[in-house]
């Protein structure tokens, strides 16, 4: 099986600029590259921060772009998003019984679980998984049984050694870890938020993240003049078979033929 992972697209209403780039242009180029070279992917996951300012126009623009994208997409929300506004535009996007943007997708061989780590409040950037969301996750993990299971979340539950990001990670990580223990065969966990390529092994579970499509977080803050840097964006090409998981972090801009 092949699927695509994208994160942190940060669209701006009216296709406006952001931090020296144009998010809509980056997304267009990303979709074009995926369609040309990986059109056989079974699905695509966009793991949050769909919009920079949680604007209805940004969500409407994303919806229009995805109508032209032949690969089915699972959309998640992040700290820059607004849950209610997102759901008012993407009315058919699945959610759980408490209206959190959480869902699961099951094939004959595998289970994929998508989490909503958005913490309510204006300009709140750390994440949470409340009791209702953790209860839902526990049920999904129990129902998954022995099937290989893959999780997707926006915020990481651990520090990554970048103070700015460590201050806005998912808190309540002990409760999250306890909930994970109900999964019998968790293979990997994908996340976003940090705007960097990372691989982390946390309490025996492996995690990986992607760069943003628009702007990146420097590993060392003092190495750049501003808050962000212009390292290359990438999307993930994920290949799964019976006994192997491979993730290609695919830089798609300015590829020389």
Predicted feature locations:
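Active-site-proximal beta-strand elements of phosphoester/diester hydrolases
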Residues: 1-13, 109-119, 150-152, 205-211, ...
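N-terminal active-site segment of His-dependent metallophosphoesterases
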Residues: 1-61, 68
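Active-site environment of divalent metal-dependent phosphoester hydrolases
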Residues: 12-15, 52-57, 79-86, 120-124, ...
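His/acidic metal-ligating clusters that form di-metal
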Residues: 30-43, 125-206, 237, 241-246, ...
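A cross-domain feature marking catalytic cores of carbohydrate-active enzymes
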Residues: 48, 77-80, 153-155, 249
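Extended active-site neighborhood of metal-dependent phosphoesterases/phosphodiesterases
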Residues: 56-139, 175-185, 203, 225-240, ...
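Metal-dependent phosphoesterase/phosphodiesterase active-site architecture
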Residues: 206, 211-257
